[in-house]
Amino acid sequence: MHIRLLLIFSYIYYCVRIKTNPARYFQLNAPFFNPSKGIFSKLDIDRLIPQRWRLRQSADNGLVKDFQFPVFVKPEWGQNAYGIRRADSEQELNDIRHQTADSIMPRIIQEAATEAREFEVFYILSAADETKSAVLTVNEALNITKTDFPINSINNSNTFYRELTASLNEEQLSAIWAHMRAFGRFGISRVGLRSDSIDALVNGDFHVIEINLFVPMPINLLDPDKTLKQRVSAILNTTWHLAQITRHIPKDQVAQSVFFKKWWVARKVKMLPQTP
């Protein structure tokens, strides 16, 4: 909670300092917002992912039958793993369908990535040079249960995160950034993916689990080994560059009512059944 508050207030402070409207934050990724659905649709965003990195997924319309289990049943939009369920068999999938039959949020089914490790790459685009990142952190999601195919998130008490950025050299970070740029021009994003190793990730051998475009949390701030001083420094660096890229939003970009539509949808998603 304290991290979130410091993120919010320092961002507002920097926006005021450079004379930009902090509410413009919600327009950073507005070109990728689906106004008719009122969400950043996972299906829309999935189409932006190059085929080599894309997991098989589809709307849960009952027409696709030959899934490789396990699969994850997800709301078409959600944050921090809200509403995600795992099915290890056809029977479990049908049980989940029955339990969520009354949900007004459409579901998608995504096959599991089989790579050994899970990573989260958080970045903010550079306002000075959009071919570069102003902030780029590489983090590993770990689960104390050691189970296969866990649903990791900041709300899962069994999940914790380690930042790996400092252990990577410039060449490795540049390669990872090149992969991230292939998805599209996102002002801010957090990409969840699975890969067998850092070397495999650098070489482009991975599958994308999810791309978060709506208030993505800088996961590196949750590394339990970070000192208070390191956290505060990272927060201020993040929000300073976030304010800069907010000011850099093109003036002719069509504004979308992202915040209010997403707030309403978020309330509905949080009412969905959660994985125990």
Positions of PLM-derived features:
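Short helix/loop capping segments that flank catalytic or ligand/cofactor-binding pockets
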Residues: 81-83, 96, 219
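Short secondary-structure junctions
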Residues: 51-54, 67-69, 104-105, 182-187
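Phosphate-binding site of ATP-dependent enzymes
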Residues: 90-170, 174-175, 179, 194-207
